[in-house]
Amino acid sequence: MIAEEALNKTWFIDIDGTIVKQLYNQDIDKAIDSLGENSYTIETPIEKSVTFLNRIPKEDTVVLTTARDGKHKDHTERMLSHFGVRYDRIMFDLRAGPRYLINDIKPAGTAGNTDPINTAFSLNVERDEGIDLKV
C-alpha cells in the first residue's frame, strides 16, 4: 500500500447538481413556504452519488459545500438524512463560482512515504449526472 492510500482523506463535495438535481435558493424558499418541514420532498437524489458517498471510508471526512443560503440548513439536513447521505460537515453560503483547493505536497518521509505525496485533487462532473468514481 502506498503512503497516500494509508492516509485518511477529506472530501469536499458540492450538493446541487452533484448529489441532488440542481435547485436554486428561490426554489427552496417556495418549497419551504408551501410544504413546511416536508419541503425536502422537492429534491431529487442522484443515486450513483449517494452510493459513492456511502462507500467513502468512515475514517475519511466528508465536507459538503453549497451556495445554498444558511437559512436552508434545516431543509438541507432533512433532505440529506431522508436520502441517507453520509457527511460530517456542511459549508453553506459559498459563492456559486469556481472553487479552488490548495494544499501542500507532503515531503518524502513525513507519512511513511518514500516519495512526495500530492494532497490536492479536483474533479469536475457534468451537472445532474452524479459522481462516477470508485472509492
Where are the regions that the model predicts?
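HAD-like aspartate-dependent phosphatase fold
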Residues: 1-135
